[in-house]
Amino acid sequence: MSGAGVPDMPALHAEDVTLAIVASTWHETICDALLDGARKVAEQAGVTDPTVVRVLGAIEIPVVAQALARTHDAVIALGVVIRGETPHFDYVCDAVTQGLTRVSLDASTPVANGVLTVNTENQALDRAGLPNSAEDKGAQAAAAALSTALTLRQLASPS
């Protein structure tokens, strides 16, 4: 199981960061939990009203993240892809990962990849931030996005 070596999430002060979250609706219980975790971290960091956009599946996430990256300081991508019996899993995971990376680099905007790519539904549930989950990948993605946005801001305005 994942979770070993996870760093402590820093206390973030991101009150003036504009944040967007794009989350799929496929595997609703898991995606809703990921979204809840991301929203909690955002609120703790002072981001009270992030833009939230829901899409059907993971493959739609990168293009919506691209639109959001044009108008926000950070974007969080949330979803889940569970391996099936065909190569479709590999194609979707690769397309989503490459798409999100490209959006982040092209827009110079952090896009945190909180899209779970797992072999089983139980693995996804264990990472979704539910009461019995070992991890909260939605919360971790939010911390990564906000932390990176603040780092980029510091780099852009040297002391």
From Swiss-Prot:
GO BP field: riboflavin biosynthetic process
Catalytic residue positions: H88
Quaternary structure, from the entry: Homopentamer.
Any one Gene Ontology cellular component term annotated for this protein: riboflavin synthase complex
HAMAP family listed in its UniProt record: Lumazine_synth
Listed GO MF terms: 6,7-dimethyl-8-ribityllumazine synthase activity
Keyword vocabulary terms for this entry: Riboflavin biosynthesis, Transferase
Record's catalysed reaction(s): (2S)-2-hydroxy-3-oxobutyl phosphate + 5-amino-6-(D-ribitylamino)uracil = 6,7-dimethyl-8-(1-D-ribityl)lumazine + phosphate + 2 H2O + H(+)
Protein name: 6,7-dimethyl-8-ribityllumazine synthase
Positions annotated to bind (2S)-2-hydroxy-3-oxobutyl phosphate: E85, T86, R127
Enzyme Commission number(s) of this protein: 2.5.1.78
Binding residue positions for 5-amino-6-(D-ribitylamino)uracil: W26, A58, I59, E60, V80, V81, I82, N113
Function: Catalyzes the formation of 6,7-dimethyl-8-ribityllumazine by condensation of 5-amino-6-(D-ribitylamino)uracil with 3,4-dihydroxy-2-butanone 4-phosphate. This is the penultimate step in the biosynthesis of riboflavin.
Name of the top EC class for this enzyme: transferase
Pathway stated in the Swiss-Prot or TrEMBL entry: Cofactor biosynthesis; riboflavin biosynthesis; riboflavin from 2-hydroxy-3-oxobutyl phosphate and 5-amino-6-(D-ribitylamino)uracil: step 1/2
Superkingdom classification of source: Bacteria
